[in-house]
């Protein structure tokens, strides 16, 4: 099991390695393992959700490497928002189809941009987590 300080160290080391100026903090109320908040330029994480996600997505990686995979995906959101100025008003005021289309585009971009930074030894696992995450989300939506 990884604790807050373990995850914070992985985040700090990774951000330093890539000279990324992104804040980070833990948030025990977060309902997902990690997220990026564009308005505050902050990566937030919930260590309990991170550990729960690790147990759901079973791949042959250390817990530390799994956190790196999650982190690079979240950094992908940061890179997407830096490179593409999405009209966020669509998420608030758009119709259902527009909202889903934009969310899907942002999600795809996040995975793609995160993939550009992830170290070579983690690429196959990154792609596997992407595939399993998509299946997990699809399954969650069909089980409602």
Stretches found by the model and what they are:
Residues 1-40, 121:
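A metal-dependent hydrolase signature that marks the N-terminal structural subdomain at the beginning
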Residues 5, 73, 108-112:
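A structural signal for well-ordered alpha-helical segments within the folded catalytic domains
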Residues 23-65, 81-82:
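Active-site scaffold of zinc-dependent metalloenzymes
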Residues 50, 70-72, 97:
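The feature represents the first ordered module of a protein
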Residues 62-65, 98-104, 112-144:
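Long, well-structured alpha-helical subdomains associated
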Residues 64-91:
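Catalytic Zn2+-binding segment of zinc metalloproteases
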Residues 81-112:
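Post-HEXXH active-site segment of zinc metalloproteases
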């Amino acid at each position: 099991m990884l604790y807050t300080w373990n995850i914070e160290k992985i985040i700090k080391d990774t951000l330093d390695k890539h000279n990324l100026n992104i804040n980070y903090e833990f948030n025990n109320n977060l309902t997902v393992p990690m997220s990026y908040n564009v308005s505050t330029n902050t990566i937030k994480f919930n260590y309990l959700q991170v550990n729960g996600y690790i147990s759901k997505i079973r791949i042959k990686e250390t817990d530390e490497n799994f956190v790196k995979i999650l982190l690079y995906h979240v950094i992908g959101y940061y890179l997407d928002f830096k490179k593409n100025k999405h009209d966020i008003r669509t998420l608030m005021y758009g119709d259902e189809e527009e909202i889903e289309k934009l969310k899907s585009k942002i999600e795809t971009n996040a995975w793609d941009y995160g993939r550009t930074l992830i170290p070579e030894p983690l690429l196959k696992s990154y792609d596997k987590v992407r595939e399993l995450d998509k299946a997990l989300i699809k399954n969650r939506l069909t089980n409602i």
